[in-house]
Amino acid sequence: MRLWFCLSFFIILCLEHFPGTLADERNVPESEEKTEQFLRDLSEISRLQRRPPGFSPFRGKFHSQSLRDLSEISRLQRRPPGFSPFRGKFHSQSMRDLSEISRLQRRPPGFSPFRGKFHSQSMRDLSEISRLQRRPPGFSPFRGKFHSQSLRGLSEIKRLKTTHKIH
């Protein structure tokens, strides 16, 4: 602990005496006149430079120019219903086609568009199978037949071990 303290004190002491380091920064007085002059210049600049409408300092001049051009274009050109400028003409057309297709084609009960036809069919088959087939005690559909079988086998093994210890 003392070694680290002495070492850090020595490094700071050396930095104080080298030119261009802490000593130079500390010896330059920060004048209040310079600070006030800087603030006055900054306020004059902000008063003289009026920003055009739609200008954002984070996006720059060209972005605001393109926004103004976009508003002129949108006034000149009328879009069809369902058009979105962020998606484009083709996207909105395909969305309309998709809605017409979904109206024409009725899905069977249990169908999910995220899983597909075969998944819903297998889910319906699974429910029919589960109604027809009763599960043995200890069976879990999440673990499978073999797991439950091994659990039942485990209880039989425990019974056999205890009977062998008694004899």
Swiss-Prot record:
Q: A Gene Ontology biological process annotation?
A: defense response
Kindly report the protein's main subcellular placement as a broad class.
secreted
GO CC annotations?
extracellular region
State the UniProt keywords alphabetically.
Answer: Amphibian defense peptide, G-protein coupled receptor impairing toxin, Repeat, Secreted, Signal, Toxin, Vasoactive, Vasodilator
Its localization reads: Secreted
Query: What's one GO MF term for it?
Result: toxin activity
- Domain of life here? Eukaryota
| Record bears the keyword Nucleotide-binding | no
One Pfam family named in its UniProt record:
Bradykinin
Query: What is this protein for, i.e. what is its function?
Result: Vasodilator. Bradykinin produces in vitro relaxation of rat arterial smooth muscle and constriction of intestinal smooth muscle. May target bradykinin receptors (BDKRB).
Signal peptide residues are 1-23
Q: What is this protein called?
A: Kininogen-1
State the similarity comment: Belongs to the bradykinin-related peptide family.
Lineage of the organism: Eukaryota, Metazoa, Chordata, Craniata, Vertebrata
Q: In which tissues is it expressed?
A: Expressed by the skin glands.
